[in-house]
């Protein structure tokens, strides 16, 4: 009887000590992912400015835009939230014209940046992203014959300059969106 009790006590003690070892060994973030995400730290902060959309040629609509970019999970992801509002003509009312949330990360296995975005209408996109000539670009298909791509560059003044383009054939692109934002903090 005493032997069985002693064995139970020893087993319990070993289980507790093993659990403490697991707790003490916190998982470490991937250095490769952290290094890749450091290249995007220039986006972190609060940004405000103006932008325009022109989905139908000749029908451009301008509005104030704000973007908030936060580093999360110890630098492993960026959380990007954008909001644009425009005054309703003839009133003091505002209507939301841009309301988006994105999660930007680096996929170490595939060696690509990924952007998962959500907009207030419920639509989501999963896009691969990459660095281009002085900018950062992501693109996605919105159907069999419609593609979108966005490019963000930091200007010499330190402004966030972004363009959005659309294509029906993947070779000819038409700019439908542009915004210039100043960093507040």
Where would I find each of the regions flagged by the language model?
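N-terminal secretory signal peptides that target proteins for export/translocation
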Residues: 1-5
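Bacterial N-terminal signal peptides
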Residues: 8-19
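Hydrophobic small-molecule pocket/channel-lining residues, especially in calycin-type beta-barrels
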Residues: 24-185
């Amino acid at each position: 009887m005493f032997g069985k009790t002693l064995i139970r006590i020893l087993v319990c003690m070993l289980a507790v000590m093993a659990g403490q070892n697991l707790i003490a060994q916190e998982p470490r973030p991937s250095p490769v992912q952290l290094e890749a995400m450091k290249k995007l730290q220039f986006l972190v902060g609060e940004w405000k400015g103006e932008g325009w959309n022109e989905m139908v040629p000749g029908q451009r609509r301008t509005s104030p835009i704000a973007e908030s970019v936060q580093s999360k999970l110890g630098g492993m992801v960026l959380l990007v939230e954008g909001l644009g509002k425009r005054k309703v003509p003839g009133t003091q009312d505002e209507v939301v014209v841009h309301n988006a949330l994105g999660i930007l990360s680096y996929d170490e296995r595939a060696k690509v940046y990924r952007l998962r975005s959500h907009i207030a209408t419920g639509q989501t996109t999963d896009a691969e992203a990459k660095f281009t000539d002085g900018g950062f670009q992501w693109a996605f298909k919105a159907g069999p014959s419609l593609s979108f791509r966005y490019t963000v560059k930091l200007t010499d003044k330190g402004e966030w300059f972004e363009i959005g383009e659309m294509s029906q054939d993947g070779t000819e692109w038409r700019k439908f969106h542009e915004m210039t934002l100043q960093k507040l903090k």
